[in-house]
Amino acid sequence: MTARKPTQDPPRAPAPVDSSPAISGLRYRKFFAALTRLQTDRPGAVLLVALLTVVLAGLAASRLTLRTSLSELLPANKESVIVAEQVSQRLSITSTLTIVVEGPSAEPLKRFVDALVPELQKLPPNLVGSVDAGVHESRKFFEQNKLFYAPLEDVEKVHAEILARYEHEVQKQAGFDLGIDDEDAPPPLTAAMIREKLDERTKASGAKDPYPGGYYIEPGGRLIAILLRTPIPAGDLDRTRDLLEQVNTVIARVDPKQFDLAMTVNFTGNLITAMEEYSQIKNDLSEVGVWGVSLILGVVFLFYMRIRVLVAMALSVAVGTMWTFGFTYLLIGHLNASTGFLVGIVVGNGINFGIIYMARYMEARRTSSIYDAALTAHVETWLATLAAAGAAMVAHGSLLVTDFRGFKHFGIIGGMGMMLCWIGTYLFLPSILALSERISPIPPEHGVVARLRAGYGRPFAYLAHNFPRVIAVTGVLLGLVSAALTVRYVLSDPIEYNMTKTRTVPKTGHTLARQLMGRVDKVVGRQGQDGLAIMVDRIDQVRPLRQALEARRAAAPEGRKPFDKVADIFDLLPKDQERKIQLIEEARDRIGRAHRRGFVSDSDWEEIQKHMPQGKLKPIGIDDLPEQAARMFIEKDGTRGRLVYIVPSTGRSVWDGHYLIEWAESFRSTTLPDGSVIKGSGGAVIFADVLLAVVEDAPKAILISIVGTLLIILIAFRGRPVALVVIATLALGLVFMMGTLSLYDAKLTLNGGLPSLTLVGLKLNFLNFIALPISVGIGADYALNVMQRYRLNPSGSVRDVVIETGGAVILCSFTTVLGYLALTSSINQAIVSFGFSAAAGEVSCLIAGVLVLPAFLRWREIRRARKAAESSAKTGTSEASSDAPAPEA
């Protein structure tokens, strides 16, 4: 059996006459002719306008700031955001600069701290709120009130010992001791006796003093910490640098080397880690953006192999990109975690319009003048590219219907970027080309360059031309399989609840500040870092709130407790104070009598006074607590006690989205017996709301993106049947994408010697979800351009369309995919997952638009030609074409 020669293109039936101005361009030809004349005759004036607008946009864009807080992703009117903001406004100093001093021995460290603290306290109050070098203040207070804080049982024991000894001494002095030996008598009234009784529990437990000498010093005495609390919010980089500069000046003046030549000073605390994290994120976004733009421009250069073309396209997309971020400043004012990496995406998608325009311009330039080539490119590409830009804008715009601020901002910037890049391309790219050709005309393509350009589309053209039925049928079958996988994926709850997979992981590991923070936490304690604050309006609401929360916890089943405990300022007050006061006063009275009667020496008397409360005794109140001990419960205005903390459950991770939702719901809203409602918020509630927003808003955004894109396709093709072909191609690409996501983490294992496939899809988070609606609009680009060029060239073959336009369309996909793949190098795992998801969508829609669609068109041509030949043979009006393609093997 001999091999069959490749089939030739069957003659295409003449395209129906189309008087539509949207397709023929006749109605708009005058407009494009005038525009092209201006662009090619006066390119300098046109580009001067471009330069002026770019400078203005650049000045605005340079003022954009980056906000990394998760609360920036939620709407400003979201209750959790409002409540969290209200709590933060009332919380006292929260930012901490920790000064970490290391040295070979403890005593020089303590002396240096004693010398440094007074100097730090002299710094301006707008920089330094307080300087905490240890627990000296709290220790002094609790030592003076040791009997109040001792367990009632211990106070009763001391009371009984004092009364018994006093009675023993009185009887002994009166001669009524009945010969009792001192060995059997109650212990003498000394300070040592009182101290010993109160310290029995501590000694029995074997607990060591966590703060030797009252300092925050590491066991072994090689590290000591000073906590400098400041009103500067974490993330205020300018004021943080100012504080560091002044603190360094003070440290240099005190000079640690005077105390020990080996002594070193470093910084940590949330003020430093926030600055590091901001810098890491900013640098990461910059690197990802530069890497993405470099890859995009590199692949464009490899397609055209002309520096001039690369520069022209780079300049035109730079105009649109600069406009985009200039308007971003005017409309929004900042970037957030969802929009900070959009530079590469805007460039990767925005350059596609220039690629399509340039491909047609270069093709026309072979036989036409600059003006005619530019006019041809205008007339023949504007509709397809505008439809693609509109579809992309609608896809991004679908995010505006959500309540999620991160989605809205992404939609505004992305959608605006697509349209502004289209405008920038069609306004200024022709002038850039015209000006460059005045200097030196672009030589026609030949040899390697021409073959290289054709090479982009040639593999697709070869497959679609020679195996149309196989490709089309395989595409449909894979689409059906992907659709089934998509249904399974959606029903399996694809939301990412493991929040560790959305955080930032530095490439270099933990910084010195992070390492020191871990060591300092072990010395100082986490000081409520895991708990969340709930704010009440009145102090009398604290107890009812606590009771309501504890009742809610008690009602939860074992193993599903939403939190461990509730903490308020009243936990810092001694218990059984009235009873203890009665016992202390009675004991103090007996000791006083014993001293006056000579039962207690003057030296013991003075020592005992240090352990006995002086003056008139009254219960210790919240205002009596030292500032250091009560700091967590003190508001900015000095009000105490209106803060209640709720501590997460032990053994349940605050990075588990399921638990976060449970925890958040347990204190989000609490109704007190008097009818007042207390709202809670914080990181847990905001995280939970982010997850819930993804679940609620994802279907809405996807539906609107699909509907909007379908309308644009129908409008672009005037509702003709070919629009349905484009829509079907887009649908095929989307199910390919979803099928790919559903297999993201699939595992093939052997079970009993038989292969077993476990399907685990990519989980959707607050960022990668965006890839779904935008892939709808951007993915329509490829099918739109191929079908439009196919209709405009009724005498051309599918193979020629794919080689010429398909090559440019493939390049468009490459630029977009590379922009997305650059995101996978990010240190933020949410951005990485978005990059993969969006790239999967691009590749899927490319395969559908540049391989399956041409294969279908080619197969349809063959079938139509065959039917026409059969019809002619039957009627006898014409002979079968001698070069008609033989049936496929």
Where are each of the predicted segments found?
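Solvent-exposed, non-transmembrane loop/terminal regulatory segments of multi-pass membrane proteins
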Residues: A61-P104, K110, T202-Y215, A461-L463, ...
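Extracytoplasmic
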Residues: D182-I307, E550-R553, Q609-T709
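Interfacial segments of transmembrane alpha-helices in multi-pass membrane proteins
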Residues: N283-L335, V401-R405, L703-G761, S825
